Amino acid sequence: VTVIWSPRAIRHLSDLRAYITRENPDAAARVALTILTAVDRLAEFPNLGRPGRVTGTRELVVPDTPYVIPYRLRAERLEVIAVFHGRQRWPTRLWGVTTPRP
């Protein structure tokens, strides 16, 4: 499975790393590496995440972090949609589909 990051997901990862770097650059690097490693693992085990709150998606809760990675599988592609903090309010629309509120 080939992992493809959406522009939104790339921006989220970059923004969260910049935010954490202001207080603790080492922690920012560790968190980013943990997220990247978790997503790389999805290439081997694409169904590792739980069913997503949007039909047709899955969500990976990144171990040892408060982050959740929504993604979807399309043939031999795994598309990373975004990177969200677990306490963050999700947008009302995600890839053109209305996101239900928990």
Task: Please tell me what each predicted stretch does.
Residues 29-30, 50-52, 91-92:
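Short, hydrophobic secondary-structure boundary micro-motifs
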Residues 1-32, 100:
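Arg/Lys-rich, positively charged N-terminal/basic patches that mediate binding to nucleic acids
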Residues 18, 25, 40, 44-47, ...:
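Generic structural signal for secondary-structure transition and capping sites
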Residues 17-20, 46, 82-84, 94:
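Short, flexible helix/strand-to-coil boundary loops that buttress conserved ligand/catalytic motifs
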Residues 6-8, 63, 81-86:
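Generic beta-structure capping elements
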Residues 37, 44-78:
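Basic/aromatic recognition patch in beta-strand/loop cores that engages polyanionic ligands
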Residues 68, 72-102:
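Enriched for short, Lys/Arg-rich terminal
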